[in-house]
Amino acid sequence: MPTKMRTTRNLLLMATLLGSALFARAAEKEMTIGAIYLDTQGYYAGVRQGVQDAAKDSSVQVQLIETNAQGDISKESTFVDTLVARNVDAIILSAVSENGSSRTVRRASEAGIPVICYNTCINQKGVDKYVSAYLVGDPLEFGKKLGNAAADYFIANKIDQPKIAVINCEAFEVCVQRRKGFEEVLKSRVPGAQIVANQEGTVLDKAISVGEKLIISTPDLNAIMGESGGATLGAVKAVRNQNQAGKIAVFGSDMTTEIAQELENNQVLKAVVDISGKKMGNAVFAQTLKVINKQADGEKVIQVPIDLYTKTEDGKQWLATHVDGLP
């Protein structure tokens, strides 16, 4: 073989080997992902565990930088600024406020950092412009499942004009949609149903206080709908505190150990609709890797499974399969 051809072949071989080595090194490069959890309720503990488990089981090296915003928009903003300064590969978050979090998400996006929302996000215009993906259980369908369960209960108990109070989390559009779905199905099946009150009570202590006031101020109240986990457990405790167990039913959202125990008891809590925090965490991490690697398909809003629990056995089984207490 002529010397020139041999030299050319060797150079090509060296280039190939060098390219392979660089590719392997790039593949081994550690990714850094920021993760922000909205508050300290059990659902977000489940999401955190799901994200951590998925990161641990992933074939890529991932460093997670995590915090809990505790429902505080300024904490959320400050942490996102820290993540932007660190030049992380992506940010996972459940937005504190649809409108209030928009500037924060915009800053990250304009810095070239993809933002992946889960459960709650910024307004639709902001999602379209600044968010790479938004994972959520269809809130309208969520509410419809709960409305069907409530209708089953009222029909079975021959209550044709039930009075229902709502303890809400309607600072978030997902909660508004949950209620709309609930009302739509309930009123189609039980036309005499009335929503007689709708008050905010996302945090447990406030939900208990609101629930008790609603019970005292609303004669012949038949049921309370809780739009979130805190609202649900608060409603149950309010019913018990006012000695209305067996008289006022609760239809709720978001499973936790205490909520599962109440469903197993089935005296007050009659149905719960839930999106598993762990499953959400797994799904949002998987989608984040797709976004980072530019492998995401065209769908920006991604639906996750919604579960309905209505029986004593459902509560018992949930407790048996969630011994760590994380939803």
From Swiss-Prot:
Pfam families: Peripla_BP_4 (PF13407). Keywords: Periplasm, Signal, Transport. Gene3D superfamilies: 3.40.50.2300. Its main location: periplasm. Disulfide bonds: none annotated. One of its GO terms (molecular function) is carbohydrate binding. GO terms for cellular component: ATP-binding cassette (ABC) transporter complex, substrate-binding subunit-containing; membrane; outer membrane-bounded periplasmic space. One of its GO terms (biological process) is transmembrane transport. It is found in: Periplasm. Residues 1-26 form the signal peptide. PANTHER family: ABC TRANSPORTER PERIPLASMIC-BINDING PROTEIN YPHF, D-XYLOSE-BINDING PERIPLASMIC PROTEIN. Belongs to the bacterial solute-binding protein 2 family. Probably part of the binding-protein-dependent transport system YphDEF. This is ABC transporter periplasmic-binding protein YphF. The gene is yphF.
